[in-house]
Amino acid sequence: QRQMCIRDSYGIKFAVIRNFRGAPVHGYISRNKDGMYQMITTIRGAYADIFWFSLFHELGHIVNGDIAKDSDFIDVSDGLDLEKERAADLFAQDSLLEPKSYADFLQRGDFTLSAISNYANTQNVMPYVVIGRLQKEKHISYSAYSDYKVRYGWANQ
């Protein structure tokens, strides 16, 4: 619900578009003269956990004030502004999984599917969000629970 408040309080128009071949872009944000943001993301890579992380990463750029009025912000993750990228990553991580509870979950060290599902339920996210983060942070291998990772696609593919 916090995220819906963010969208409403910042006035964000949101769209998901097809990724085009060769484009390194995960997201694009512009701000109109009236202050309304337009945020566009793709389902590049198709994994649902990556989509949701990317969505909250882009929201992080808005909340953190990275987009000036009348300018475009193309998030290519090319390392040109590591501080902004790290801050947006942190916003996404903390929005999806509450930091203290995630630290406690890691401390317990139980990464069974049952433990992951139970923890995901306490965070109001799908288990694939937790699985993706555990994989990214190398707590589990990328092959672990891969059958439980949802992939998005376009209806006419």
Regions of interest found by a model, annotated:
Residues Q1-Q3, D8-Q157:
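Active-site hotspot residues in diverse enzymes, especially metal/ion-binding acidic/histidine motifs
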